[in-house]
Amino acid sequence: MPSEPTLSEIRAARELIARHIHRTPILSSATLDREFGAKLFFKCENFQKVGAFKARGATFAVLSATDAEVRGGVVTHSSGNHAAALARAAAIRGVPGHIVMPDNAPKVKMESVMRYGGLITFCSPTLAAREAAAAKIQEQSGAALIHPFDNWAVITGQGTCVLEVLEDLPDLHMILAPIGGGGLTTGTTIAAKAMKPGIQVFAIEPAGADDAFRSMQTGIRQPQDHPHTIADGLRTGVGEKAFSVLHRMLDGVITVSEESIITAMRKTWEVMKIIIEPSGAVPLAALVERKLDVAGKRVGIILTGGNVDLDRLPWQPDR
């Protein structure tokens, strides 16, 4: 896709990928409602294919490509859930899926890529190394690059998540989503504002990876230098395409501490009895810190994924 998607294009994307993804449930918790003084609705993308919302964007990007575009397969660079999502999408399309991963990527995410038949190339844990390795694979195989977030087709697919939220809950006042590269937040903002112009959309990110916050404050996309956070899915800087939308349409960016992320993650596990990864806990962490006025409001929260290394949980002392 060459440009920013419309609501009708996001709806068409949902039709194309519907057979290959779950319409994930929306759960609530009376306990958390009482604690935060609001009606909270959790969109459980931790129950999605590959355990994360990334299945939506990767599947649409691969299935919407022409035969000529994917004749040599597809390639991406990712340390996280997009890697597994693209490997799975390539398998559905019947083409090779080349995945460049840093050698320090979480073990659980490496294993997920291999489970879906992805062809992994390891590299040093820098963006330059990842991009160079992906470019080499492109040159050698003719594979099409599917960027993890700075890709309009990926953004379009990610926007299908909030379609389901607002179809089921049209009277929401606010939606909270974590932000890393910005694909989910961008698709969410475009679709939500088109479906319900008065709704508020906030992006939440770790204070140790706060480029989105700084970018919105200055009006210029800021670099993500040396991110430090347990939310490994949010260590990437906001993409150019995402920022071109978000600086115009997003209601704000909230930063949260590592301690609040751990509290929110553990609270979700213990109270709701569901597994989420640190990145998925970041929106609830904003409520833990009381950084948003949600009193009496109906708030949608996107739980983005549930892929965790059970041997290295963030509340364990040796993490």
Kindly give the residue locations of the regions a language model identified.
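PLP-dependent amino-acid enzyme catalytic core
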Residues: 1-319
